A protein has these predicted regions:
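Surface-exposed cleft-lining segments at the edges of enzyme active sites
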Residues: 20-23, 57, 98
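Charged, compositionally biased N-terminal leader segments and the immediate start
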Residues: 1-12
Length: 110
């Protein structure tokens, strides 16, 4: 399965991320595109929110795969859209369990 196949499912309002999580875990390019959808902040809600749903599951199962995106994800916490701010907080929470670089200290100081 590739990103285009996943993206075809984004148009539904009852999106289930589960069928796509393993692909995102296994395929770095798919995962990167999904993260880009989330952090870009310009996409239609179905695209960024459904991408977020997949990425959240990836972060829950294997947070190491998303940890390198910490700064890009956290940058959303100042976004004008409250969904983006909420996504930033939610994903960072998933990454705290492996915060070996102690990146959360900078957030606590904010």
């Amino acid at each position: 399965m590739d990103y285009q196949e996943i993206a075809r499912h984004f148009q539904t309002t009852s999106f289930d991320p589960q069928p796509f999580v393993q692909t995102a875990i296994d395929d770095r390019k798919v995962r990167e595109k999904l993260v880009e959808n989330v952090v870009d902040g310009q996409n239609h809600i179905n695209e960024y929110f459904n991408s977020y749903l997949i990425i959240k599951e990836v972060a829950t199962k294997n947070p190491e795969l998303i940890y390198d995106e910490w700064e890009r994800i956290w940058a959303l916490h100042t976004h004008k859209n409250s969904y983006h701010r909420w996504i930033a907080h939610d994903l960072i929470t998933q990454l705290l369990v492996i915060d070996h670089e102690d990146k959360f200290e900078a957030i606590k100081r904010e």
